[in-house]
From Swiss-Prot:
Gene3D superfamilies (UniProt xref): 3.40.50.1970, Dehydroquinate synthase-like - alpha domain (1.20.1090.10)
Keywords associated with the record: Amino-acid biosynthesis, Aromatic amino acid biosynthesis, Cobalt, Cytoplasm, Lyase, Metal-binding, NAD, Nucleotide-binding, Zinc
One annotated GO molecular function: metal ion binding
Protein localization: Cytoplasm
Pathway(s) served: Metabolic intermediate biosynthesis; chorismate biosynthesis; chorismate from D-erythrose 4-phosphate and phosphoenolpyruvate: step 2/7
Role: Catalyzes the conversion of 3-deoxy-D-arabino-heptulosonate 7-phosphate (DAHP) to dehydroquinate (DHQ).
Taxonomic source organism: Buchnera aphidicola subsp. Acyrthosiphon pisum (strain APS) (Acyrthosiphon pisum symbiotic bacterium)
Pfam families in the cross-refs: DHQ_synthase, DHQS_C
Domain of life: Bacteria
Keyword Cytoplasm in record: yes
Protein name: 3-dehydroquinate synthase
Positions annotated to bind Zn(2+): E187, H250, H267
């Protein structure tokens, strides 16, 4: 029997458990609410089909689940409506009814595609998240945000659709290329900058242990991030105010991802640079102390994350992408800025010249 830590995302009738442990995807009772005789569709990508898919697929089949599968292409460039329609087609071809369950086995891209498909198939079916990347384990799998990209903007087509459960198996991280592990750390550091100075200090002391996949350090890291996000979602499920703080660095970072072409920059890499730009903006405005800015910079560098944007992307070219950000209201850009380590706020009416200067400092 594996040791499983459990958290609960409290959202009334949409509440669901988060299970965290090592080697837990083959535990008999882990796939709640599935039961023998239920229909399910496993959604994964070509890479994980060779690494992890059989562990889940055959375990569920042996458990009496009527399991089918659809294997998608791997990469951010495939987070599209066309790829999502492949899931819908597989559900229809295999005659899945409204009581089916989609199971997302993969990183943020698979989670988004499967979650969005679950939200629209026959007006909504259940889905289970099994995140396999650090980025998806600490962030993307929790909270119910699902989306696909558009050529003009990232995550512009989507919905809020909460999973029935989230199963975080730390052993899945062993399948990750090292740069993907590092990329995921950007979201971990984001939580610390925005919400928890003590956690930031802990990261400064334990970053090497996390990156070496030390079980104790990684378990604590993932659980802490999930706790912070769960608390926030319970207060603001649909990102009307507080939850938007989780977008630290994303307004700048998404501009990099779209401009460079989806998949050319890993999401966490772009967010790392975006957080540097946001921190520099805050410093220029007189909010963030220089000593805190430098601590953020040093931790990102020690993690192996980039702190400078693409050399072929001018500061001015960021602005059109940033104006298409989902936080824009009535034509006014809103940015999440750190005020200190452990505290952030949303600001609008920021002088564009300050934003441009902050971007130039990070090129």
């Amino acid at each position: 029997m594996k040791i499983v830590e459990r958290l609960q995302v409290v959202l009334g009738e949409r509440s669901y458990p988060i299970s965290i442990g090592a080697g837990i995807i083959q535990e008999d009772d882990i796939f709640w609410p599935l039961k023998p005789g239920d229909q399910a569709m496993l959604v994964t990508n070509k890479t994980l089909a060779n690494l992890l898919k059989d562990k889940v697929f055959y375990h569920l089949r042996k458990s009496g689940i009527k399991i089918d599968q659809v294997i998608l292409s791997d990469g951010e460039q495939y987070k599209t409506l066309n790829e999502m329609e492949l899931i819908i087609s597989a559900l229809l071809e295999k005659k899945h009814a409204r009581d089916t369950t989609l199971i997302a086995l993969g990183g943020g891209v698979i989670g988004d595609l499967a979650g969005f498909a679950a939200s629209v198939y026959q007006r909504g079916v259940r889905f289970i998240q099994i995140p396999t990347t650090l980025l998806s384990q600490v962030d993307a799998s929790v909270g119910g945000k699902t989306a696909v990209n558009h050529l003009l903007g990232k995550n512009m087509i989507g919905s809020f659709w909460q999973p029935s459960s989230v199963i975080i198996d730390i052993d899945c991280l062993k399948t990750l290329p090292y740069n993907e592990l590092v990329s995921g750390m950007a979201e971990v550091i984001k939580y610390a900058i925005v919400f928890d100075k003590t956690f930031f200090c802990w990261l400064e002391e334990n970053i090497e242990s996390i990156l070496s996949l030390n079980h104790t350090a990684m378990s604590y890291c993932i659980k802490k991030c999930c706790e912070l996000k769960s608390q926030l979602i319970a207060l603001d499920e649909r990102e009307n105010n507080l939850r938007a703080l989780l977008n630290l660095g994303h307004t700048y970072g998404h501009a990099i991802e779209v401009h460079a072409g989806y998949g050319n920059w890993l999401h966490g890499e772009a967010i790392s640079v975006g957080m540097v730009m946001a921190a520099r903006t805050s410093e220029l405005l007189g909010h963030l102390k220089t000593i805190d800015f430098k601590r953020i910079l040093v931790l990102l560098k020690r993690t192996g994350l980039p702190i400078k944007g693409p050399k072929n992307m001018s500061a001015a070219s960021y602005l059109p992408y940033m104006m298409r950000d989902k936080k824009v209201i009535s034509g006014e850009m809103r940015l999440v800025l750190p005020l200190s380590i452990g505290k952030a706020e949303i600001y609008s009416n920021i002088d564009k010249n300050i934003i441009l200067t902050a971007i130039k400092h990070s090129q």
